[in-house]
Amino acid sequence: MTVKITQSDIEDDLNQLHIGVQMTGISEEDGTCTATATRKGKSVTATQQAIYNVNRTECGGLRFSLDDLSSGTWKVAVAYESPKYTGLSKTISVKVP
């Protein structure tokens, strides 16, 4: 099972950072994704219930309010946990304006 961040967009009109994730190699809907953004010792989290999608599992709606994220580069990683599986994505960098 692999956890992969597939989307990271600043949505200015909605004042949020949107993170999308896919878990390949599994197809289930009883897991949870937790995204953690960190910068200068501050951590902010966003959580979503996983969604079953034929040949994979997804979390496409992980969102952080930009009010909670100061301007600069944030490190973001996503953990997946279910009764059967656990996994962690690679960390990505996201620039917040």
Which sequence ranges carry the predicted segments?
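Short edge beta-strand/loop segments characteristic of extracellular beta-sandwich folds
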Residues: 17-25
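Short solvent-exposed strand-capping/beta-turn motif centered on an Asx-Ser/Thr pair
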Residues: 24-28, 83
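Solvent-exposed serine/threonine-rich low-complexity stretches and specific carbohydrate-binding patches
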Residues: 34, 43-55
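Conserved aromatic beta-strand anchor motif in extracellular beta-sandwich/beta-rich domains
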Residues: 35-39, 78-80
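Aromatic sugar-binding surface patches on proteins
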Residues: 54-63
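Surface-exposed, short loops/turns at beta-strand junctions within beta-sandwich domains
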Residues: 63-73
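Short acidic/polar inter-strand loop motif in beta-rich domains
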Residues: 80-90
